[in-house]
Amino acid sequence: MASQGTKRSYEQMETGGERQNTTEIRASVGRMIGGIGRFYIQMCTELKLSDYEGRLIQNSITIERMVLSAFDERRNKYLEEHPSAGKDPKRTGGPIYRRIDGKWIRELILYDKEEISRIWRQANNGEDATAGLTHMMIWHSNLNDATYQRTRALVRTGMDPRMCSLMQGSTLPRRSGAAGAAVKGVGTMVMELIRMIKRGINDRNFWRGENGRRTRIAYERMCNILKGKFQTAAQKAMMDQVRESRNPGNAEIEDLIFLARSALILRGSVAHKSCLPACVYGLAVASGHDFEREGYSLVGIDPFRLLQNSQVFSLIRPNENPAHKSQLVWMACHSAAFEDLRVSSFIRGKRVVPRGQLSTRGVQIASNENMETMDSSTLELRSRYWAIRTRSGGNTNQQRASAGQISVQPTFSVQRNLPFERATVMAAFTGNTEGRTSDMRTEIIRIMESARPEDVSFQGRGVFELSDEKATSPIVPSFDMSNEGSYFFGDNAEEYDN
């Protein structure tokens, strides 16, 4: 997708920068990553973690959550105004796992939020470094995307569980800024908007008064973000209708659900970034890597290279398969929860199996789980090839928006053809084309019907050897097209519940 003049690159959003050239972008992303790494090293020192304990992904997640909580202004203010049982508004903490006498022990720690934010700022040259915080949020969001299914959330908002591939970033906090908005899927934006409209239907004052004015601005901004993800004029026009509605109600919800369905064929532009756990950056900084000087990109070879020589461990429950745990984390690291499994398998160099076949639960360990039986193992996060992350959704040409790949939101810019039965998707569009958006609906359906399954996404794009850092000789994989490669089919994963 040719970048429009108005769009900043994702790295620029990531670092809050204005237009910069590639070198400047690489340097500022590097500065952000280096800051996370320095913070992590300092926290390991504070907590007196051994080298092994510092490489434990569960400890990394606790430390990341602590700093995110320390900087969550809104929640901190809310906690101070509504003192609830057992929540100290000034402190944050979580489980830290230590290896003692050959056993893993859980220790609950508590720190002053002020102390944590001081350490964070100190690691980031005295700045708030919001970009680094957002980066960690996106890593947590990618981990949730790979771990949980959102069927219940989809059904609650009147959407169809088959739309799960549109739900990237559905657990990202509202405060995740432009970089967060870029990685949200079409379904996620639709769901946020529907929730908002439903509140407006149930609460007469939602759109009224000073608060209502702010709500309205937020509503229109979310509509514009979603509009920016669509690539056809008809879809964009329909979003204008939804945005300009005097008082949004059921008609708008209908329109949004229609648009979400249409995104199964006419893919939205959703960014993908490889965001790694803080401990990986910490390890690299500790071994003397200067991220700012070397530069870093979230969408190129750098994260692959970092994972090639990082050893990260994970706690494993008694009946979990360590190889499956590794796959889960690998997918999260590369934001590949919604990628075609055949593409992922080729890049990883190991078969990536659908989630219903994984013998592993989430990475985080609940506080009531028995530590006696916990073991730990090395996560295998290396890959055979690397590929450029995409932000286009993989439609072959924007002018007549051909079919993107159903049940998949491509992560890697790698050529694949489109295994789908258009009839099954088109069945979702029978019936209602009347109402004020009828001409747009008709147009969208027409575009989808003329989308040719024999079109190829990412024509000529391939994967690269890990030695080919300049991406000079693409290897275009050929896939067995007999099976549709969705991670979510035949799924029995746990639901994501806050």
From Swiss-Prot:
Q: Which GO terms describe its biological process?
A: symbiont entry into host cell; viral penetration into host nucleus
Q: Which GO terms describe its cellular component?
A: helical viral capsid; host cell; host cell nucleus; ribonucleoprotein complex; viral nucleocapsid
GO molecular function ontology, one term from the record: RNA binding
Q: Annotated region Disordered: where?
A: 1-23
From the record, which residues define motif Bipartite nuclear localization signal? 198-216
* PTM statement from Swiss-Prot or TrEMBL: Late in virus-infected cells, may be cleaved from a 56-kDa protein to a 53-kDa protein by a cellular caspase. This cleavage might be a marker for the onset of apoptosis in infected cells or have a specific function in virus host interaction.
The domain of life for this entry's organism is Viruses
| Localization per record | Virion; Host nucleus
Q: Which UniProt keywords apply?
A: Capsid protein, Helical capsid protein, Host nucleus, Host-virus interaction, Ribonucleoprotein, RNA-binding, Viral nucleoprotein, Viral penetration into host nucleus, Virion, Virus entry into host cell
- Per the Swiss-Prot or TrEMBL annotation, the motif Unconventional nuclear localization signal is positioned at 1-18
Q: Does RNA-binding show up as a keyword for this record?
A: yes
Q: RNA-binding among the record's keywords?
A: yes
Subunit comment? Homomultimerizes to form the nucleocapsid. May bind host exportin-1/XPO1. Binds to viral genomic RNA. Protein-RNA contacts are mediated by a combination of electrostatic interactions between positively charged residues and the phosphate backbone and planar interactions between aromatic side chains and bases.
The family annotation for this protein states: Belongs to the influenza viruses nucleoprotein family.
Biological role stated in the UniProt entry: Encapsidates the negative strand viral RNA, protecting it from nucleases. The encapsidated genomic RNA is termed the ribonucleoprotein (RNP) and serves as template for transcription and replication. The RNP needs to be localized in the host nucleus to start an infectious cycle, but is too large to diffuse through the nuclear pore complex. NP comprises at least 2 nuclear localization signals that are responsible for the active RNP import into the nucleus through cellular importin alpha/beta pathway.
Task: Extract the HAMAP family matched here.
Answer: INFV_NCAP (MF_04070)
Q: What is this protein called?
A: Nucleoprotein
